[in-house]
Amino acid sequence: GPGYLDGRPGNFTLRAVYSYNRFRGRAPGAWDILLKEAQEEVKELFAFATVPALAKDYINPNLPKQYGQLGGVELIAYRSYLEFMAERYHTSEGFLIKLNGKSKAYGLRTGDTLKVPNIAPFRIEDISVGRMHKEDEQLSKHNIVIDTKNKQIFVYDPSQPTIVIPGMAMVVSDEDQEPLGKMIAMFPTTTGGEQFIHHGVWKVVNCVEFPSWRYDKQFLETGKRGTDVVDVAHGPNSPVGVLWCGLSKSGIGIHGTSSPSTIGRSQSAGCYRLSNWDAARFPQYVRPGAKVIVR
């Protein structure tokens, strides 16, 4: 994935192109054939979408902005219909304002129509509180590589042979002692600062939708657990977003986010953040038992 859609090319667009071409067995910079495929697949860049009635169940304009004030809030919801629609269509509030104008964007209500990127929507209504994704005979064997330098998460299928093509190092270096298999997915990610990165080999131990979260200011700042904590409920604007995949390294996981536009552009306290639309798709590729290599 290229990250959130803003109508402009950037580093994550390039990395998405390189990864897709690699998946197809082509040189990373094979733009001509990629553009032809894209134009055949997506006839129109934009579409018109209606704000669904169910959106009102996920909006709380009075949601506190400070983590320490979220205790007791039942749902960590979106703060506006604009935010709901931006995440639903993999973009930013600013880009929807650019496409539709401030008056329309800020005045959104259920039933209103909005110009959006032409992409399959992220359906928050399909996420269930506490739903666990269990081990899977195939998906639990997949390998994950977290490239902390380039801020990407790669998923490999060892049942498919590795495709060796010129320029693979432009995506991620292959220095493993054993073959990882074919690269089948790439997600942009936010990683921690160097002091919080735990290089090595781990495993996915659990994967749960709409997780609750414990705000521990001391742990986020130092990596050591404190006693002054706040229990935070689930929701799309929870700091861990719509999914938590815990690793065998205690306290560390791959999870969603409350701020998709910062993915790959900020730092975490040690975990690996995905946009909520990518986090929702993650269990289609990975289940508990999968190996995780942090580079």
Role assignments for model-derived ranges:
Residues 1-2, 6-12, 48-90:
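Primarily a LysM-type cell-wall glycan-binding module
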Residues 8-58, 94-134:
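Extracellular LysM carbohydrate-binding repeats and other cell-envelope/extracellular binding modules
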Residues 14-18, 82-83, 93, 97, ...:
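Extracytoplasmic/secreted envelope proteins and their assembly/folding machinery
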Residues 74-170, 186:
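Secretory/export targeting leaders with adjacent low-complexity proregions
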